[in-house]
UniProtKB/Swiss-Prot annotation:
Disulfide-bond pairs as recorded: none
Domain of life of the source: Bacteria
General function of this protein: Associates with the EF-Tu.GDP complex and induces the exchange of GDP to GTP. It remains bound to the aminoacyl-tRNA.EF-Tu.GTP complex up to the GTP hydrolysis stage on the ribosome.
The protein, known as: Elongation factor Ts
KW Protein biosynthesis (keyword) present: yes
Subcellular location, record wording: Cytoplasm
NCBIfam families: tsf
GO MF term (any one): translation elongation factor activity
GO cellular component labels: cytoplasm
The keyword Cytoplasm is annotated on this UniProt entry: yes
Keywords: Cytoplasm, Elongation factor, Protein biosynthesis
Length: 294
């Protein structure tokens, strides 16, 4: 396998996502042959990237729009370059219109949404281009998520986080509280069995690597792995999390007492996985590398 040259952009992405210094990030990327995700895993295994949650840092602006029908809800992310434009009435009107068009036409593909008739003889894409020219910022329709169900609760936290949750039983207030909880705690799944196998395997690998570094006997290491996985599932599964309305109780216990079953949910947060441009970063990295090579 040929060696990948570590670029300033790659170093910046790893630095933004871990909070580590430039030289540490450069070294980690060299060891992972330029693979950012592998570098993050390796840093977590070694204990350098202790703030694991920083791996999901937000680095873009825009808005999440919720369009809701009788038995279906659409979440749409529309991006811009600054929070100033995200609050602009022209941007907001465009984003709301596009979300409602997607719902009305039941279109779940971003490319297909771009071709929908927007009005005034324009398609959505043509309206987007016109808005870019008017506002002076790049604007993109990034992604759409759809949730179906007889009972759907929705919650939007500011402009940046949108949640829809499908459930059976309970009241509308319970549904709204659930959506608020998901916005705040960001679970990846409803229950343990819903966590993706690859995600669980990746986390187990990281936990095991750190446990074995302790030098303890295998039977103790196994218990450390079990404990680590249990803690991980308590953090990422909805039913195991402490309830946002009463953190003395677990979500699962509250729902059981109220006769509520969660069928599914969708959560979008503006800019997940997108990095902002930092104009002088390449020069900063180059200067640091030059010093390191002296």
């Amino acid at each position: 396998m040929s060696e990948v040259k570590v670029s300033a952009k790659m170093v910046k992405e790893l630095r933004d996502r871990t909070g580590l210094g430039m030289m540490e990030c450069k070294k980690a990327l060299e060891e992972s042959n330029g693979d950012v995700e592998t570098a993050i895993d390796n840093l977590r295994k070694s204990g350098q990237a202790k703030a694991a949650k920083k791996a999901g840092n937000i680095a873009a602006d825009g808005a999440i729009i919720i369009a809701q029908g009788d038995s279906k809800a659409f979440l749409l992310e529309v991006n811009c370059q600054t929070d100033f434009v995200a609050k602009d009435e022209n941007f907001a009107a465009f984003a709301e219109t596009v979300a409602n068009l997607a719902l009305e036409n039941n279109v779940t593909d971003v490319a297909a949404i771009a071709e929908l008739p927007y009005g005034n003889g324009q398609t959505v894409e043509e309206a987007r281009v016109s808005l870019v020219q008017k506002i002076g910022e790049n604007i993109q329709i990034r992604r759409v998520e759809v949730l179906e169900g007889a009972n759907i609760a929705a919650y939007r936290h500011g402009l940046r986080i949108g949640v829809v949750v499908s459930y059976e039983g309970g009241s509308a207030e319970t549904g709204k509280n659930l959506a608020m909880h998901i916005a705040a705690f960001n679970p990846v799944a409803v229950a343990d069995e819903d966590v993706a196998a690859d995600l669980l395997a990746r986390e187990k690998d990281i936990i095991e690597a750190k446990a074995r570094e302790s030098g303890k006997p295998d039977n103790i290491v196994e218990k450390m792995i079990e404990g680590g996985l249990r803690k991980y599932l308590e953090e990422v599964t909805l039913l195991r999390q402490p309830y946002v309305m009463d953190n003395e109780k677990k979500v699962g216990d509250v729902l059981k007492a109220e006769g509520v079953k969660v069928l599914g949910f969708k959560r979008l947060e503006v800019g997940e996985g997108i990095e902002k441009k930092q104009e002088d970063f390449a020069a900063e990295v180059a200067a640091t590398q030059a010093l390191a090579n002296k």
